[in-house]
Curated annotation (Swiss-Prot):
Entry GO CC: cytoplasm
GO biological process, one term: response to hydrogen peroxide
Listed GO MF terms: 2 iron, 2 sulfur cluster binding; hydroxylamine reductase activity; metal ion binding; peroxidase activity
Cofactor: [2Fe-2S] cluster; hybrid [4Fe-2O-2S] cluster
Binding site for hybrid [4Fe-2O-2S] cluster: 251, 275, 319, 407, 435, 460, 494, 496
Catalytic activity line of the entry: A + NH4(+) + H2O = hydroxylamine + AH2 + H(+)
Family the entry assigns: Belongs to the HCP family.
Entry protein name: Hydroxylamine reductase
Main function: Catalyzes the reduction of hydroxylamine to form NH(3) and H(2)O.
Location, primary (coarse class): cytoplasm
Amino acids binding [2Fe-2S] cluster: 5, 8, 20, 27
Length: 552
């Protein structure tokens, strides 16, 4: 059987249409796993439909609220490739739905939900049979009836909500819960399960998702800073230190903290990778002296870099790609919603098996000459620099700020972002976040009167800090955010980037430049609408874009 998935930037693009629709997607996801993820999403939409109904009766089931976004997160690009676990999530969704339905019926014997997903049952235990059932829920199944524009808007909402669900899970792990957010999530997820076809309603929904995600990023920021302190500028070594070692990748700071606690006194050093790099800026994490540095570059290079790492690797969230290529599948471990067939999974927060494996391996035999980069420009630090930025602008020492961030990826056109960074004039500042920074974060950019020209604000969700800084600067200068000497040049890859974009658009931020390509699910008509409403456009050349942005 074949699949249909168009959710990430590397999706197949042909004159006949966009999307991975063969036996395997560009990410390595098989048609089986992709189709079963469609089935899981349908089950989650049915669960959300009953969660909405339950709230009408004052019933709030926290097991449902914690499970639903987490399971949805498992369908995000490069998270879970393990078909049996995807089916397990679908079964759990249905079991939770039936329990919630029973709670509703206990209050009102006539309780009903008008949603096509509300009574979904799995037809078999056989993966092949379930894959055939999943064909009913392929996202493009009614494309001929609704047209590409409606399908594109549905997917914009679905993928945006998926990105928000990921951030909800990150926040939930840190003890953050906001009933209004979960109520809104369930309402939108249930509505998408009705296969809506009204263009205006879908556009409004996309903006609602963006506004909701701003609140999600707020509680995630509160969770991270509340537990681990406010990030402050910190130098991080990106070269090896002699000793046994563990590499931890992803976004989950709690997993990193637990690993650091459990490796104290063991002689095992811990390295961050990918989006875990900003962890070094948090006081409660950098206090561990055996958190010795950051290893590697963008996630897309992991098959080479992980193969060379002389210790075990822990994946706490996206992005994982096929570990058998580099033959390190026997020493990579998955956590939480991450999965790869045949790879060992850690069900709880006990890392003793990983530590034991690290102690049996050689580790780095010698220390390399250190290469230090600076991270840790969190929200509090950025706000503390607001007056300095305004002073530099008023004295014409600082001409422009470029927010140059987002996802990294394998496409060659992404070298645009390296070229852009190196061509930013000396009187301009680069604010960066997310893993796109690996395109230029080891280069030297100097400073403007002591203020670094390259300012690393953190993970992708730390777009919240950048937004708060922009709002603060606008308030202090008595202008709108769009009137600031600030331009956003964003690289995208997956659904977290989509919801960040929706968040910015929902807040009224205009004239964003994105690349390296437009999302495959957005038609030329939809791109034209977004350009007309928000000034959103794709990158062209570094020279042309730089000239246009500096003259705006």
């Amino acid at each position: 059987m074949i699949m249909f998935c168009v959710q990430c930037e590397q999706t197949i693009r042909t004159p006949a249409g966009n999307g991975c629709s063969y036996a395997q997607g560009m990410c390595g996801k098989t048609a089986e796993t992709s189709d079963l993820q469609d089935l899981l999403i349908a089950a989650l939409q049915g669960l959300s439909a009953w969660a909405v109904k339950a709230r009408e009766y004052g019933i709030i089931n926290h097991d449902v609220d914690s499970f639903a976004p987490r399971a949805f997160f498992s369908t995000l690009t490069n998270v879970n490739f393990d078909s049996p676990r995807i089916v397990g999530y679908a079964r759990e969704a249905i079991a939770l739905r039936e329990a919630l339905k029973a709670q509703c019926l206990a209050v009102d014997a006539n309780a009903r939900v008008d949603n096509p997903m509300a009574d979904l049952q799995l037809v078999s235990d056989d993966l092949g049979e379930l894959q055939r059932q999943a064909a009913e829920f392929t996202p493009n199944k009614d494309k001929a009836a609704i047209g590409e524009n409606i399908l594109g808007l549905r997917l914009l909402c679905l993928y945006g909500l998926k990105g928000a669900a990921a951030y909800m899970e990150h926040a939930h792990v840190l003890g953050q819960y906001d009933n209004d957010i979960y109520a809104q999530y369930h309402k939108i997820m249930a509505w998408l399960g009705t296969w809506p076809a009204d263009m205006n309603a879908l556009l409004e929904c996309s903006m609602e998702i963006g506004q909701m995600n701003f609140k999600v990023m707020s509680i995630l920021d509160a969770g991270e800073t509340g537990k681990y302190g406010h990030p402050t500028p910190t130098q991080v070594n990106v070269k090896a230190t002699a000793g046994k070692c563990i590499l931890i990748s992803g976004h989950d700071l709690k997993d990193l903290y637990n690993l650091l606690e459990q490796t104290k006194g063991t002689g095992v050093n811990v390295y961050t990778h990918g989006e875990m790099l900003p962890a070094h800026g948090y006081p409660e994490l950098r206090k561990f002296k055996h958190l010795v540095g950051n290893y590697g570059s963008g996630w897309q290079n992991q098959q080479v870099e992980f193969a060379r790492f002389p210790g075990p690797i822990v994946m706490t969230s996206n992005c994982i790609i096929d570990p058998t290529v580099g033959a390190y599948d026997d020493r990579i471990w998955t956590r939480s919603i991450v999965g790869w067939p045949g790879v060992r999974h850690l069900d709880g927060e006990d890392f003793s098996a990983v530590i034991a494996q690290a102690q049996q391996m050689a580790g780095f035999l010698y220390s390399e000459i250190p290469h230090l980069i600076t991270v840790g420009f969190g929200r509090q630090t950025l706000l503390g620099a607001a007056d300095t930025l305004i002073d530099l602008v008023s004295r014409e020492k600082l001409r422009h700020i470029f927010l140059l961030g987002g996802c990294d990826g394998a496409r060659g056109e992404r070298h645009y972002f390296t070229d852009f960074a190196t061509n930013v004039p000396d009187d301009c500042l680069i604010l960066t976040l997310a893993c796109g920074k690996y395109r230029f974060n080891k280069l030297e950019f100097g400073d403007i009167e002591g203020l670094p020209r390259l300012v690393d604000a953190g993970q992708c969700n730390d777009a919240y800090s950048a937004i708060i800084l922009a709002v603060t600067l606008a308030e202090k200068l008595g202008c709108g955010v769009n009137d600031l000497p600030l331009s956003l040049v964003l690289s995208w890859f997956e659904q977290k980037a989509i919801v960040i974009l929706l968040t910015l658009l929902s807040l009224g931020v205009k004239n964003i430049v994105t690349g390296p390509t437009a999302p495959g699910f957005l038609t030329p008509d939809l791109l034209a609408v977004l350009n007309e409403k928000f000034g959103l456009r794709s990158i062209t050349t570094v020279e042309e874009d730089m000239k246009q942005l500096l003259s705006a």
